Amino acid sequence: MSANAEKEHAMLAEVLRDNGYHEYRARLQALLDIPELASDFEIHTRITDGFAATWLVKLTERGVLTPVERDQIIPLRTLKSRIERDQPLTVDESDRLFRSAHITAMAEAVFGEAGKAKRWLSKPKERFSGLTPMQMLTTQQGTTQVEEMLLQIAEGYGL
C-alpha cells in the first residue's frame, strides 16, 4: 500500500464523527489484532511483513468473510498450502485482507453493529453497477469508492 493510500485510509476513517474513529480502530484490532494506537507506518509494516494465513481462516470461520470473499483474497488451495508450510500471506494478499478488514471495521463503526454492517457490505449497490461493496475491494480505487460511500452515510447523506 502506498503512503498516499495509507494517508487516505487514516483521513477517511478519522472523519467518522464522535467516537467513530475509536470504534473503527477497536474493531480493526478485533479483526486483525492491530493495536488501536498503531501508527499508519506500523500498519503498513504489518501488511508488508505478511499476515499469518490463519487470520483469513479465523475471519471466515467467524463469518466476517464469506468463502467467496476469502477466495477474492487468496484461492483456498493456495491458502491451505500456506498454512501447511507455515508461510504468511504475500504483500498483495495481506493488502487485500487489510482492505477487507478495514472496510468491515468502518462499516461496523458506521452502522453500530456487525450484523447491519455485514448486510450492507453484501448487498449489491446501484452506485457500483450492481456489485456489492465487498466485491469492490479487489482494487484500491474500488476500496476508496466504498470508503466514500460509508463516509457519506456517516455524515447523513443517504444510503
Swiss-Prot record:
<comment type="function">
    <text>Probable antitoxin component of a type II toxin-antitoxin (TA) system. In vivo probably neutralizes the toxic effect of cognate toxin Res.</text>
</comment>
<dbReference type="Pfam" id="PF20432">
    <property type="entry name" value="Xre-like-HTH"/>
</dbReference>
<keyword id="KW-1277">Toxin-antitoxin system</keyword>
<dbReference type="Pfam" id="PF09722">
    <property type="entry name" value="Xre_MbcA_ParS_C"/>
</dbReference>
<dbReference type="GO" id="GO:0003677">
    <property type="term" value="F:DNA binding"/>
</dbReference>
<comment type="similarity">
    <text>Belongs to the MbcA/ParS/Xre antitoxin family.</text>
</comment>
<dbReference type="InterPro" id="IPR024467">
    <property type="entry name" value="Xre/MbcA/ParS-like_toxin-bd"/>
</dbReference>
<comment type="subunit">
    <text>Homodimer. Forms a complex with cognate toxin Res; the 2 toxin molecules dimerize and each contacts an Xre homodimer. Most Res-Xre contacts are between the antitoxin molecule closest to the toxin.</text>
</comment>
<dbReference type="InterPro" id="IPR011979">
    <property type="entry name" value="Antitox_Xre"/>
</dbReference>
<dbReference type="InterPro" id="IPR046847">
    <property type="entry name" value="Xre-like_HTH"/>
</dbReference>
<keyword id="KW-0238">DNA-binding</keyword>
<protein>
    <recommendedName>
        <fullName>Antitoxin Xre</fullName>
    </recommendedName>
</protein>
